[in-house]
């Protein structure tokens, strides 16, 4: 049976039936084990081959050991290349359709045997590969290109197959393809590495992604801004901020100037890593690099400060933003309404809210919710209730946050019945209460002496399948403890030891934040052993709990588990870990962690550097104190005044008064400290 490929050509392409009348050894495309690696050996028969069976890697014959000599022989005996290919005479769509009907390698090779003498250009074959999305067929097609048709190996062909293999998450085979490229003396290019790095990174395999990045740098293949930016964004989304910072450092070391998007991402990263000064300094660096900060840059920095309750710093950034005439947007204004409220600047918050429309900025539900909360916290209950009802009269959107805010306001006025009525009202309007709604009403009822109603609601929530969040559990525990029902509170805590209706990570966080060290420890160890701890913040939460309770051995235990799991600690965790090593007198380990993190490109806040100085001092290693002091002294990112004061204090504590005096005199000489009056 034959099908016609193109009306202008006398060539025809055999369409093979899906079942064959004879038996042969083959691997069907649909049944190849996913876990099979490229370097495993299988016996496969291939048509158009001088040997009926032979050992092959998963998809192809093993490349000859002596690659150089084999390629020389190939060139020597290669037929004269036709100047005119048959590309335009072959219908690629029909050829692809025929390829899709093949069930194994033998059928595919037989189908393509018509073109074994390379009547089609390598460009045509690469295009064919790029349109074949099935990773198994694309591998077999690549084998035919190199082993049957004897095309010169092409990095473009490998790149296309790598893409298909990685889309199918066949990472072991991707490794094998890369090794095969090396064996064929092909140099992986930027696209090769970009595909590998991005694919491994998207799957959260950052150690592997960074390993590919290291190989790329060793091969002197230059990365581009897009590649580094993608890695930074992937790290940020996975909350691995130390790796994002490390990649950003590599980007700049490569001589690439970050663009506005990269800078804005890094402002967010530094903020999430609690490196606030570094986040602020990026604005300065952007100006120096000729990349003007925009509204997103400033609003991102504002968000960083607000999330960490640094409201005065946010006020300073907003003033700078207005000074440089950077346009304000709704996000920025909403943030600043919140900031004004947090700083008890209610008039400023009120003025900004009511002036939004004058600036041609239409307030949204977030704007209304924020000013409602500001009114409530300032105990301007009349204004809050008036605005809430005004929203309803003007059909302005209200959501669960709006109602939660108003329920909380009624709780402050001890009007628990009105709060209860609001819960019923929101449900009648089709607004579903959430965990915060329930925890707020339970808290209000508890304070009003309506514990029976609170307990009944909590029990209904547990049996109804509603998500029980940290706040809700803690609220009920506190409600029981307030009235002396310690048995009920302990039963809830006991339930959290073996949670069957909430994730273990949630249980750990609840217990840790409640200061329940023993219970949190028990659940954490069980969860870690069973591989349930996936969130990096859970490790940080446990380290923080142990550090607060001076359980330094446990701090080190969790840190080592964290590193075993492949997570990078943030600067706060590093500070607590260094302190724990110091308390345990394990100075060498502290020094190792400090150096390793710096080599990875971590940027430490001053407190970490100062803590390391303190550890060296505790060890009586003043040579290291002086060495680190001199290095930090030349670092423009370190607060010079605080550095000198810390070092002087360390020398003074060790009775090295001459050295302490020397450091203080150096401060005066450099104008850091005012000289004594004459």
From Swiss-Prot:
Highest taxon above the source species: Eukaryota
Chief location bin: plastid
Pfam families, alphabetized: PPR, PPR_2
Compartments, as annotated in UniProt: Plastid, Chloroplast
Segments annotated as PPR repeats: 154-188, 189-223, 224-258, 259-293, 294-328, 329-363, 364-398, 399-433, 434-468, 469-503, 535-569, 570-604, 605-638, 639-674
Keyword Chloroplast found: yes
PANTHER family attached to this UniProt entry: PENTATRICOPEPTIDE REPEAT-CONTAINING PROTEIN (PTHR47942:SF63), TETRATRICOPEPTIDE REPEAT (TPR)-LIKE SUPERFAMILY PROTEIN-RELATED (PTHR47942)
NCBIfam families named in the record: PPR
Protein name in the entry: Pentatricopeptide repeat-containing protein At5g39980, chloroplastic
Species: Arabidopsis thaliana
């Amino acid at each position: 049976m034959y099908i016609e490929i193109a009306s202008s050509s006398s060539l025809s392409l055999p369409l093979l039936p899906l079942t064959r009348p004879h038996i042969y050894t083959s691997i069907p495309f649909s049944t190849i084990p996913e876990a099979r690696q490229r370097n495993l050996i299988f016996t496969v028969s291939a048509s158009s081959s001088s040997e009926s069976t032979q050992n092959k890697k998963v998809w192809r014959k093993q490349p000859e050991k002596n690659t150089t000599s084999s390629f020389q022989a190939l060139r020597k005996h290669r037929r004269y290349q036709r100047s005119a290919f048959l590309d335009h005479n072959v219908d690629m769509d029909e050829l692809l359709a025929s390829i899709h009907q093949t069930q194994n390698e033998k059928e595919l090779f037989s189908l393509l045997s018509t073109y074994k003498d390379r009547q089609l250009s390598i460009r045509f074959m690469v295009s064919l590969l790029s349109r074949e999305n099935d990773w198994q067929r694309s591998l077999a097609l690549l084998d035919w290109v190199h082993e049957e048709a004897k095309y010169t190996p092409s990095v473009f062909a490998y790149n296309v197959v790598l893409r298909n293999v990685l889309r199918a998450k066949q990472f072991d085979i991707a490794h094998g393809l890369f090794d095969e490229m090396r064996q064929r003396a092909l140099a992986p290019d930027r696209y090769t590495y970009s595909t590998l790095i991005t694919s491994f990174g998207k799957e959260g395999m950052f150690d592997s992604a960074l390993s590919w990045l290291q190989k790329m740098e060793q091969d002197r293949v230059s990365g581009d801004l897009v590649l580094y930016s993608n890695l930074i964004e992937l790290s940020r989304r996975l909350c691995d901020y130390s790796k994002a910072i490390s990649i950003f450092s590599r980007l700049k070391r490569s001589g690439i100037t970050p663009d506005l998007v990269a800078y804005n991402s890094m402002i967010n990263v530094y903020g999430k890593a609690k490196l606030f000064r570094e986040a602020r300094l990026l604005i300065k660096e952007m100006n120096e690099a000729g990349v003007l900060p925009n509204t997103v840059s400033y609003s991102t920095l504002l968000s960083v400060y607000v999330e960490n309750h640094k409201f005065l710093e946010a006020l300073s950034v907003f003033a700078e933003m207005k000074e440089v005439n950077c346009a304000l947007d709704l996000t920025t204004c909403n943030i600043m309404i919140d900031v004004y409220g947090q700083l008890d600047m209610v008039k400023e918050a009120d003025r900004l809210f009511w002036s939004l429309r004058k600036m041609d900025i239409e307030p949204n539900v977030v704007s209304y919710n924020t000013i409602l909360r500001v009114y409530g916290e300032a105990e301007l209950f009349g204004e809050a209730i008036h605005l809430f009802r005004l929203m309803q009269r003007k059909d302005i959107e209200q959501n669960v946050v709006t109602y939660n805010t108003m329920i909380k306001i009624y709780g402050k006025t001890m009007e628990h019945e009105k709060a209860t009525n609001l819960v019923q009202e929101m449900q009648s309007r089709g607004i579903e209460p959430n965990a915060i709604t329930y925890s707020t009403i339970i808290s209000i009822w508890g304070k009003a002496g309506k514990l029976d109603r609170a307990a009944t609601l909590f029990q209904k929530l547990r049996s109804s399948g509603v998500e029980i969040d940290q706040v809700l559990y803690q609220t009920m525990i506190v409600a029981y403890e307030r009235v002396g029902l310690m048995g009920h509170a302990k039963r809830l805590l006991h339930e959290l030891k073996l949670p069957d209706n909430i994730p273990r990570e949630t249980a750990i966080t609840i217990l840790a934040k409640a200061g329940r060290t023993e219970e949190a420890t028990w659940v954490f160890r069980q969860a870690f052993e069973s591989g349930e701890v996936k969130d990096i913040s859970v490790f940080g939460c446990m380290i923080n709990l142990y550090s607060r309770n001076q359980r330094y051995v446990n701090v080190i235990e969790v840190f080592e588990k964290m590193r075993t799991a492949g997570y990078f600690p943030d600067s706060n965790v590093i500070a607590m870990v260094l302190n724990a090593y110091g308390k345990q007198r394990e100075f060498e380990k502290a020094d190792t962690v400090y150096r390793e993190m710096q080599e990875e490109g971590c940027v430490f806040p001053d407190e970490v550097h100062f803590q390391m100085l303190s550890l060296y001092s505790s060890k009586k290693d003043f040579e290291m104190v002086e060495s680190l002091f001199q290095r930090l002294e030349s670092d423009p990112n370190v607060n010079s005044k605080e550095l000198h004061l810390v070092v002087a204090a360390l020398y003074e504590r060790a009775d090295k008064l001459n050295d302490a005096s020397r450091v203080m005199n150096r401060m005066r000489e450099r104008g850091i400290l005012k000289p004594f009056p004459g």
